[in-house]
Amino acid sequence: HMRNGNNQKYEHAFQVGLMGIDLASEGPISKKQGSSYLFNYRLSTTSLASGGQSNLKYQDLSFKLNFPTKKAGTFSIWGLGLIDRNKADAEERAKWETQADRQSAENKIEKLVGGITHKYFIDENTYLRSSLSATYSKDRISADQETLDGQSIHVGDIQNRKWDILFNSYINKKFNSKHTNRSGIAITGLNYDLDYKVSPNFGLDRPMEQISKGNGKSMVLSAFSSSVIDISHHVTASIGITTQYFALNENWSVEPRLALKWEPVDNHSF
C-alpha cells in the first residue's frame, strides 16, 4: 500500500543527477478535513552518464489522494504508471564474432494501475476495506539481424497486452487479544491480446513466422477466510481456506492453509 501524504504541511523535493531527475511533492488538500496528496515522478536515462552510448530509459509516476470523512470512512484515489525502454544496437561488422553480435533489439514495457479504495470502521475492532482497480500492461520486443551480404531481416516481433479489472472486499475483525480474522472476496476480469512472430532459426537468416495470435477474456472469482491465533506467548497459528473459480476452463480449487510460528526468544522465530 502507498503511504498517505502529509496532511499538515507541504513538502517538495527536486533532484537532478547523472541518472536523471526526481520530483516529489506532498501536503494537505484540506487541513480541516485531514485530506492529503502524494506525488512522485522519475525520469531516468543512462545516456546522461554514458555520453549517449547507452539506450536504457525509463520513467514512472505515482500519486495518492486521501480523503477521510467523519461518518463514511476514508476514501483513497491512487495510481501508478511506468514506461521502460531498452535498445541494443548490433556490433560493427568488423567486430562480429557470434550470431548475437549481428542482432539489434528493442524492448518496451508500459504498465498502468489505478483505483479507488474505501476503508470503514464498523466498530473499534472491526473494519471493512473495499477496492476497485484497473491494470494495463503492454510488452513489445522486436529484433533485427544483419546478414553477411549486408541486408537486415526482421527476426522477432512479440507483442503482449493485458488489461484487468479487479474488485476485492474483506472484513477484518479482532475478536479478542488472541484471535483476529480476515474474510473476503475478489472478482477479477481478465483480458488479453497476443501477437507472437519469430524466425524459426536465427542462424539461417530466415524471415519471421506467425507462432501465436489471439485475444480473449475470462474471469476469476475467489473467496477466503484466515485467522491468526495466539496459542501461547511463544506460539502463533495461522489457519485459513481459499476457494477459487476460473471461468476459462470452469475449474474450481480449494486450498486449506495452516502455519505455526514459534518464537522462543525475542527477534528469533521458526
Question: For the regions a protein language model found, what residue spans apply to each?
Answer:
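Outer-membrane beta-barrel translocator/channel fold
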Residues: 47-53, 58, 78-99, 269-270
